Regions:
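Flexible glycine/acidic-rich beta-alpha junction loops that bind and position SAM and/or redox cofactors
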Residues: 12-18, 115-121, 217-224, 255-268
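Acidic/histidine-rich catalytic cores of soluble enzymes
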Residues: 47, 139-235, 239, 247
Length: 291
């Protein structure tokens, strides 16, 4: 099993996308080439990257990134969204995403569906409003899937922050193409009130890739807070999650994702904590899970 890192794990350093802290202006603290230089030292085998990391998706820039990854012996996976509201750089059509992934030498392109859900969330699984969106995505996938096959790029549909695992499976079954599968995120099911362990069980057999992450539920006076932590510090049963992936999927890579909150810290301290969380997550995978 190879071990990689989703670049969003360094979002406070300026990588992955702008879901992070918008208060900090100026030059990013790390770019994709610096991370690739450091990846072998960190003990990583690959990176799961976005258009925000590439800075430009022009052919020359993508070739430069691909060459640097090959120099370091790193696999690359590409991550894009159909309608990313927080960072429009990540929004691509299926055709654009496939072309970028192919240029990078990535064999997997992860796709966020970005569904618009009615509330209450717990009552919205396969809601008619959601199904209309899924039908539209299925039509686009039917056109894109042969292109993905020709490019050698598998499309991995994620149970992102707005998708039930059964909806992802419905879409995969609807398209019924060997180059259309899942990306299983070990946390995201919580955000639509689904049991994360059930979602992992459901999606792992159909998954091409993963976001292997951990969150902790913190009870507070007004309710609760779900917050990203280093792997092993949260409430996801990661040992069981890894067992499911090993036993029930064909995946040969684990992609760590850390979603650390800057809190009230300034950029220097927040980035120090983020790096520490990434390093601890890598150690957890190596020393506890024996990846």
């Amino acid at each position: 099993m190879l071990l990689g890192l989703h670049t969003y794990s360094f979002h406070l350093h300026g990588l992955g996308g702008d879901w992070g802290d918008h208060r900090w202006e100026g030059k990013r603290a790390m770019d994709i080439f610096q991370l690739m230089d450091e990846a072998p030292v960190l003990g990583l085998d690959g990176l799961h990257i976005t258009a925000a990391d590439c800075e430009s998706t022009e052919k020359d820039q993508l070739k430069k990134i691909r060459t640097a990854a090959e120099k370091h012996g790193l696999y690359l996976e590409y991550n894009f969204s159909l309608d990313e509201k927080y960072d429009r750089r990540l929004t691509k059509t299926f055709e654009e995403g496939i072309a970028i992934a192919e240029a990078l030498g990535a064999d997997v392109a992860k796709v966020s569906l970005d569904l618009k859900r009615p509330r209450p969330l717990a009552a919205s699984r396969h809601h008619p409003d959601v199904m209309r969106q899924l039908e539209d995505i299925a039509r686009k996938l039917n056109v894109a899937a042969p292109m993905a096959k020709a490019a050698g790029v598998k499309l991995a549909l994620e149970n992102h922050t707005e998708s039930f695992s059964s909806e992802v499976l419905w879409l995969i079954d609807r398209v019924n193409h060997p180059f259309v599968g899942a990306c299983v995120d070990t946390v995201n099911a919580w955000l639509v009130t689904e049991d994360p362990m059930v979602a992992i069980e459901n999606l792992a057999p159909r998954a091409f890739t993963n976001h292997f992450k951990d969150h902790r539920i913190e009870i507070e006076s007004y309710g609760c807070r779900l917050t990203g932590v280093a792997l092993g510090d949260g409430d996801i049963d990661l040992k069981r999650a890894y067992q499911i992936i090993r036993e029930k999927s064909s995946m040969k890579r684990i992609n760590i994702e850390v979603e650390l909150d800057a809190g009230t810290d300034g950029p220097v301290e927040a980035r120090r904590r983020e790096r520490e969380a990434v390093e601890r997550s890598i150690r957890y995978c190596r020393e506890v899970l024996h990846i």
